[in-house]
């Protein structure tokens, strides 16, 4: 009898963890992006990287200083780029005497949950401003989000990014980001 109860409890736990733990709903997707915004405001690249799946892939087309660049990244390279970007923001903030703040906003344009409730396709726009006029990064992305093992993660991203800035005494972002 003990073994039967144990087997039922173990089976229930496995079902809850593997099956029910992979169901995704609109609220979870919206909370994922809200957490991404909090991580950005906190300037926490590690937390942003933890929101990516181990199989994460990004295709990006960037428009910087009149030049177009196409690139693809896996998770490790994407995380490296995020860390470099935050380091750049920190360096520019220090050069400006700590007066350059980061503003981040996002708009979910479309959110489609798959019929099996395990993934979602999200069309989203984001804007990141540093010092209001110093630098602005605009992106339009189509993201694929999944829930697996009770965690919501970003699996794939197709993005178009535009950067513009006011040339000034602090830095030349086009040189920094194109060198990367």
What positions do the PLM features span?
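A mature extracytoplasmic/lumenal domain signature
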Residues: 33, 52-54, 62-64, 124-128, ...
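Short hydrophobic/aromatic-rich beta-strand segments that constitute the beta-sheet cores
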Residues: 58-59, 122, 154-155
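Low-complexity, intrinsically disordered terminal/linker segments enriched in charged
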Residues: 132-180
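Surface-exposed, charged secondary-structure patches
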Residues: 73-135
């Amino acid at each position: 009898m003990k073994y039967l109860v144990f087997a039922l409890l173990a089976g229930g736990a496995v079902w809850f963890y593997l099956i029910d733990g992979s169901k995704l709903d609109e609220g979870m997707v919206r909370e994922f992006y809200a957490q991404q915004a909090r991580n950005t405001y906190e300037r926490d690249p590690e937390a942003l990287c933890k929101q990516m799946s181990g199989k994460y892939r990004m295709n990006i087309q960037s428009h910087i200083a009149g030049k177009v660049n196409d690139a693809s990244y896996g998770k490790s390279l994407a995380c490296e780029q995020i860390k470099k970007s935050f380091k750049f923001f920190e360096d520019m903030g220090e050069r400006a005497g700590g007066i350059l703040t980061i503003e981040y906003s996002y708009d979910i344009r479309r959110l489609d949950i798959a019929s099996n409730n395990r993934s979602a396709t999200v069309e989203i726009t984001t804007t990141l401003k540093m010092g209001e006029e110093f630098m602005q990064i605009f992106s339009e992305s189509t993201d694929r989000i999944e829930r697996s093992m009770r965690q919501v993660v970003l699996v794939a991203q197709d993005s178009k990014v535009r950067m513009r800035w006011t040339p000034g005494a602090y830095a030349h972002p086009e040189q920094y980001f194109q060198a990367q």
